Amino acid sequence: MKQLEELLSTSFDIQFNDLTLLETAFTHTSYANEHRLLNVSHNERLEFLGDAVLQLIISEYLFAKYPKKTEGDMSKLRSMIVREESLAGFSRFCSFDAYIKLGKGEEKSGGRRRDTILGDLFEAFLGALLLDKGIDAVRRFLKQVMIPQVEKGNFERVKDYKTCLQEFLQTKGDVVIDYQVISEKGPAHAKQFEVSIVVNGAVLSKGLGKSKKLAEQDAAKNALAQLSEV
């Protein structure tokens, strides 16, 4: 924790008052489950809070930055900014991946590299920062870490995976693409959806995500990866 505190202080000028919040933000459920007798808290509730404040701040930013963009355009751009893959990238940029506490099994299976875990970690950190320092501190942090990438136009140049898949398949002829929810698991604040892509009646790929939209994007990403190998 001491090294993490030093990182936050030197790189982002952030000093937590309540270090318990910071420690909880960097504790994965797998670690908490392995230390159940010690009553260790995990970061899912902070992730829920961080997701909400991230959506709000990015929405405010896009609304002010792009007065001529439509609601649909802003929604699409926001979804690219806050998607799991993007948030995992920001976690790595901040070196957060080096400090998350994982259970032994999750560590061995490569959890420290997994986008799902790192994206959730980034949101949990935002939730902890909100509770400890307030929303203006979260705004300052995002302005330092995320906003420069938005202003470079990095996210506007990225097509979503569903669009890319549709364009690819349409080059092969007429196709009917259907996204179907296979399962929905977990509590309301930590849902896990599984979605399959059915093309002309045959299952092409499957994907996972915290929402139906994210699961669809993951399934489309997996489909594109499969098709590139053919």
Swiss-Prot record:
Primary role: Digests double-stranded RNA. Involved in the processing of primary rRNA transcript to yield the immediate precursors to the large and small rRNAs (23S and 16S). Processes some mRNAs, and tRNAs when they are encoded in the rRNA operon. Processes pre-crRNA and tracrRNA of type II CRISPR loci if present in the organism.
GO biological process terms on file: mRNA processing; regulation of gene expression; rRNA processing; tRNA processing
Residue ranges of the TM segments: none
Cell location: Cytoplasm
Chief location of this protein within or outside the cell: cytoplasm
Coiled-coil blocks: none
Protein family per UniProt: Belongs to the ribonuclease III family.
Superkingdom in the source lineage: Bacteria
SUPFAM superfamilies xref list: dsRNA-binding domain-like (SSF54768), RNase III domain-like (SSF69065)
Domain DRBM, residue spans: 160-229
Disulfide-bond pairs as recorded: none
Protein name in UniProt: Ribonuclease 3
EC number: 3.1.26.3
Keyword Metal-binding tagged: yes
Cofactor: Mg(2+)
Record's catalysed reaction(s): Endonucleolytic cleavage to 5'-phosphomonoester
GO cellular component: cytoplasm
Active-site residues, record numbering mapped to chain: D51, E123
Cross-referenced PROSITE patterns: DS_RBD, RNASE_3_1, RNASE_3_2
Residue ranges of every copy of the RNase III domain listed in the record: 1-134
GO MF terms, alphabetically ordered: double-stranded RNA binding; metal ion binding; ribonuclease III activity; rRNA binding
SMART domains: DSRM, RIBOc
Record keywords, A-Z: Cytoplasm, Endonuclease, Hydrolase, Magnesium, Metal-binding, mRNA processing, Nuclease, RNA-binding, rRNA processing, rRNA-binding, tRNA processing
Enzyme class per UniProt: hydrolase
Alphabetized InterPro entries for the sequence: dsRBD_dom, RNase_III, RNase_III_dom, RNase_III_sf
